[in-house]
């Protein structure tokens, strides 16, 4: 919001310097983004008079001018403007002047051999227009010219300062000069001199269709006024032009400019339709009942005031006349119904549209205007019709116009319910004020002064005050805590002492949080990088997903059911970026069930794809992606560090994984997840290398097991003092038989003397038979206190051999 200081001073008494005022507003929540001194645009520019103009001797398009600037001697200036001539009063930039609008410093010099000691300026060079056809003719801009040599800034309206403030979403009142004036008055205690408004003007009922009436009342209010006797060709008076220029709004004509001035002053957007153009557009007589409000039809054509041709979508809301769209509700009017130089009658629209509907409409066409920015934040219903009367009064100052009627659909009265502000709640939350005399609770008189300064109505109660917020703040001051915040803001947050709870309890991580942190550290130590993927994904025909009600994009319209799909996409992006590999993991949540009963699952998922990001000197410069066992070993390292005994069980029915290189991971006798090489068909479809490995674990179960009591307590054992006895055992089993199952049977049968068992060899060949394989194990036996003899070892070893034969149908080879 650009705030003109001179306009602000007409609404409220300002005694602070502009810097002090900006600081006050920033501390109160309206952050100052820029302070622009408009006089800097014309610093060093004075009023001059062209006494004589001659053609340049060496250039057809240049003129040599003798300019009187009130000094004893005239100065010579070479000018290239077509409209320069003798007898004109012009703005003259003296040597040394800086023109920030065009980033130019004026210097003495020669143009085609003729000296020039200054520059005659155009309005664009002074920052008063986007483009200019020639130099500024001061005679046409004002009837009272300053003395020659006087600064030109005051007569051009550049004797002002503009504050640019950042307005937060909860303060729509800050998007109006009246709102800023009220804020300044509340902060400084200064008196207000606001325009007097007619809050409840006489009006008739707008007889709209049932559908339109429902849409209008859903938004809040719709008013339309017929005004005759305006002149669309008339240029706005200087004060209107200056207010618009300082606010950064382009001038159009006197009618449109007045609607924009009212919007800047009161915060209520207005729109003027050309009454005759509407009748020509629709081919029918137009009255108040001709106007309507509906959703756009898919593909409906619309040309806005900016000339853009739009194809509307059904979620956009349009204002209609005889069912033809004439405006995007709350955003922009149509070009065909806009005010032109031929306009003599207008329909003036003053409405309150639904913030959500305006936001949806603006987003659907990719257009955000000054009007839509205000509607989106919410407006007070009480001010809607009053602003149309305010615009009518300003139009009457310019034209001999007359209102033929005001028609309204909806109730202009708003619910002015009170909010109870409890004295104890205010003191408990804010604490005492600290000053040189000590600390004390905020006095009732100060609280009442703050709330009254905002325009609130107060009535005392046993507990404190019943507060009715002013219309402009009713959306913001809806709860007790909002009122307490306002009091603190106006008094000054820095004046309240700190009163933190005492004593402060030290924070600590839960065992589950510690386990997750350790998991992250261990995986990073194993060479993997943690990532975080978006939990919102697109719809899938093959994988039912829970839809969200208000998606921003179709690609983020559903909750994810897995992590691995996005992980593969991350790998693809990294490999396309010429990375040698992508080793990643994530601790994330997936969602299943329905919108009424969402089931959340915590997963640990990851992918090992390609080479680890290390130097190749260890592999003689050759690529060395991990094989199945190397990749599985990374996961084993992490599980062993957490003291978790995870075993593998053959997995063949997971369509994502290679049927011969996949395993179900088992923890404490129950499946924990899976690990395996990506299925060749899936890897090829994703353009991933064949040696891509995927793992997915139940994070909740993993953390539960890792946080069991004494799980991380180191168990110290004495070094063995007696030798071990080792025996090798080779058996022929089915080719599909997992070594882990055999080893589990060996451990169970070899108790208590068996200390360790290791797979040392696996062999397949025709001599063993079809679908047969030989697996060899090394068994280590040891007693805690004595050396074992063959007579002690052999019975246990025979027990192991018999268990393999009985449980797995093994054929003994040794």
Swiss-Prot record:
Its main location: cytoplasm. Residues 39-153 form the tRNA-binding domain. It catalyses: tRNA(Phe) + L-phenylalanine + ATP = L-phenylalanyl-tRNA(Phe) + AMP + diphosphate + H(+). Its cofactor is Mg(2+). Binds 2 magnesium ions per tetramer. InterPro entries: aa-tRNA-synth_II/BPL/LPL (IPR045864), B3/B4_tRNA-bd (IPR005146), DNA-bd_dom_put_sf (IPR009061), Fdx_antiC-bd (IPR005121), Fdx_antiC-bd_sf (IPR036690), NA-bd_OB-fold (IPR012340), Phe-tRNA-ligase_IIc_bsu (IPR045060), Phe-tRNA-ligase_IIc_bsu_bact (IPR004532). It comes from the Bacteria. It holds the Pfam family tRNA_bind. Signal peptide: none annotated. One of its GO terms (molecular function) is magnesium ion binding. It is found in: Cytoplasm. Keywords: Aminoacyl-tRNA synthetase, ATP-binding, Cytoplasm, Ligase, Magnesium, Metal-binding, Nucleotide-binding, Protein biosynthesis, RNA-binding, tRNA-binding. Residues 720-813 form the FDX-ACB domain. One of its GO terms (cellular component) is phenylalanine-tRNA ligase complex. GO terms for biological process: phenylalanyl-tRNA aminoacylation. Mg(2+) binds at residues 476, 482, 485-486. Residues 414-498 form the B5 domain. Its EC number is 6.1.1.20. Tetramer of two alpha and two beta subunits. Belongs to the phenylalanyl-tRNA synthetase beta subunit family. Type 1 subfamily. This is Phenylalanine--tRNA ligase beta subunit. It comes from Parasynechococcus marenigrum (strain WH8102). The lineage of its organism: Bacteria, Bacillati, Cyanobacteriota, Cyanophyceae, Synechococcales.
